Swiss-Prot record:
GO terms for biological process: negative regulation of transcription by RNA polymerase II. It comes from Homo sapiens (Human). Residues 195-292 form the ELM2 domain. The lineage of its organism: Eukaryota, Metazoa, Chordata, Craniata, Vertebrata. SMART domains: ELM2, SANT. PROSITE patterns: ELM2 (PS51156), SANT (PS51293). Pfam families: ELM2, Myb_DNA-binding. This is Mesoderm induction early response protein 2. Its main location: nucleus. GO terms for molecular function: histone deacetylase binding; transcription corepressor activity. It comes from the Eukaryota. Residues 297-349 form the SANT domain.
Length: 545
């Protein structure tokens, strides 16, 4: 309806133009009138207007018949008629073709859809289109009165055609580009898309030049060595040889060597020894007997004799496995002896061996402790490496008291007794006879221990029918300090000596039995007591039983 109103506003000029041109007496009846309709610049042909159903000439005749009517009334009548006229007829009156809007929309949609351009934005092309559009508008506005106008539908058809030409150019260009891309794809090799396995003579390298100079050379520098040939001896003889080698039956026995149903353990070293002996069984067994590195089995392979020899060699040589192998176990290597030693230490046989070894001797160390491994590292009693055991508790302890400055039996003269006679033992004083009174009382303590000068020794007689036996008791009274208050014969006490300045030496007498001690004590005189000794230094009680 907006178009209708605009046409209504433009209708007075059209009517006036038509009135002047169609009135009788006017010369230009069949001339063409150019009517300007605003900025649209539409051109109308008068013949087309007259060809419509509504006759404008009749209206003009009526207007001429009534010359009394003013122009204003005529214009009003035309406007009223145009207002009552349908929109399609009004368009036809002004030169527009009536068309179906639905069909137009379908046709436009169908035409534009296949001709859609590329949706990519080209800035240069857009700028050119805008500039050209502005220039065209300027030229058209300046030449509105000079150039004839065309109908709106013809003008509207120009833009799609121009854009359609551009679309067609794009369409013409797209198949070409697709064709070029197809040719490029066809030019690519097939290996790029699908990988092939390179197998065949055409993929192998030519190494003929490298083999020309090696025809006369050996492939290996060292010659091959034959380790075993199964086609020389029968299988039964080979099994008997292995059985004798494993069981260490070196001498040939009458009858079959291999029991029935006995499984034979394979030994590659024994078979190799047989090959080196040119398949001589006896010679191979003789070599195996003296070759200790051939057969290597576990602990169960050691015979009872080898185990006893190893234990005896361990007593003699300790952990010197080289001497054990050379002197005791010649059928074994040093490595096998070491391996057997560590397996033997974890067995019950070692516990029994250690228990029997500790019964006869104990090794004395400065710290006063006994190491079990050091006990077993010694040798047998006849060997030179055997350590000397400690003195027996019944015969090995000294019975003479200690003194700092010994007047009769000093520590600096180990081989001389108090009476000037030489002693056969290396001790500072010989043993006392059992029938002599001891220097220290047995059951009585001094009455006044605080005063050393008032100390007097007490003499007790031994029992006549008691068997001679020595018992030594080292016990210090808890209420007395550990000091030495040696009293001189004149009764004046000497200077006390601190415990750190007193050294206690124990003489080793070896293994001396009671029968050896009695004749020794009877043959030598006793060593009298050199003087008074303090009980706090060493409370030594000599008892006879």
């Amino acid at each position: 309806m907006a178009e209708a109103s605009s046409l209504g506003r433009q209708s007075p000029r059209v009517v006036s133009c038509l009135e002047h041109s169609l009135c009788p007496g006017e010369p230009g009846l069949q001339t063409t009138a150019v009517v300007s309709m605003g900025s649209g610049d539409h051109q109308f042909n008068l013949a087309e207007i007259l060809s419509q159903n509504y006759s404008v000439r009749g209206e003009c005749e009526e207007a001429s018949r009534c010359p009394d009517k003013p122009k204003e009334e005529l214009e009003k009548d035309f406007i009223s008629q145009s207002n009552d006229m349908p929109f399609d007829e009004l368009l036809a009156l002004y030169g527009y073709e009536a068309s179906d809007p639905i069909s137009d929309r379908e046709s436009e949609g169908g035409d534009v859809a296949p001709n859609l351009p590329d949706m990519t934005l080209d800035k240069e092309q857009i700028a050119k289109d805008l500039l050209s559009g502005e220039e065209e508008e300027e030229t058209q506005s300046s030449a509105d009165d000079l150039t004839p106008s065309v109908t709106s539908h013809e003008a509207s058809d120009l833009f799609p055609n121009r854009s359609g030409s551009r679309f067609l150019a794009d369409e013409d260009r797209e198949p070409g580009s697709s064709a070029s891309s197809d040719t490029e794809e066809d030019s690519l090799p097939a290996n790029k898309c699908k990988k092939e396995i390179m197998v065949g003579p055409q993929f192998q390298a030519d190494l003929s030049n490298l083999h020309l100079n090696r025809h006369c050379e050996k492939i290996y520098e060292n010659e091959d060595q034959l380790l075993w040939d199964p086609s020389v001896l029968p299988e039964r003889e080979v099994e008997e040889f292995l059985y004798r080698a494993v069981k260490r039956r070196w001498h040939e026995m009458a009858g079959p060597q291999l029991p029935e149903g006995e499984a034979v353990k394979d030994s590659e070293q024994a078979l190799y020894e047989l090959v080196k002996c040119n398949f001589n069984v006896e010679e191979a067994l003789r070599r195996l007997r003296f070759n200790v590195k051939v057969i290597r089995d576990g602990l169960c392979a050691w015979s009872e004799e080898e185990c006893r020899n190893f234990e005896h060699g361990f007593r003699v040589h300790g952990k010197n496995f080289h001497l054990i192998q050379a002197n005791k176990v010649r059928t074994r290597s040093v490595g096998e002896c070491v391996e057997y030693y560590y397996l033997w230490k974890k067995s019950e046989r070692y516990d029994y061996f250690a228990q029997q070894t500790r019964l006869g001797r104990r090794k004395y160390v400065p710290s006063g402790t006994t190491d079990a491994d050091q006990d077993l590292d010694g040798s047998d009693p006849d060997g030179p490496g055997r350590p000397r055991p400690e003195q027996d508790t019944l015969t090995g302890m000294r019975t003479d008291p200690l003194s700092v400055d010994g007047t009769a039996g000093g520590l600096d003269e180990p081989g001389v007794a108090s009476d000037g006679l030489p002693s056969s033992e290396p001790g500072p004083c010989s043993f006392q006879q059992l029938d002599e009174s001891p220097a220290v009382p047995l059951s009585h303590r001094p009455p006044a221990l605080a005063d050393p000068a008032s100390y007097q020794p007490a003499v007790t007689a031994p029992e006549p029918d008691a068997s001679p036996r020595l018992a030594v008791d080292f016990a210090l009274p808890k209420e007395l300090p550990l000091i030495s208050s040696h009293v001189d014969l004149s009764g004046d006490p000497e200077e006390t000596v601190a415990p750190a300045q007193v050294a206690l030496s124990v003489t080793e007498f070896g293994l001396i039995g009671i029968g050896d001690v009695n004749p020794f004590l009877a043959a030598h005189p006793t060593c009298p007591a050199p003087g008074l000794h303090s009980e706090p230094l060493s409370h030594c009680n000599v008892m006879t039983c």
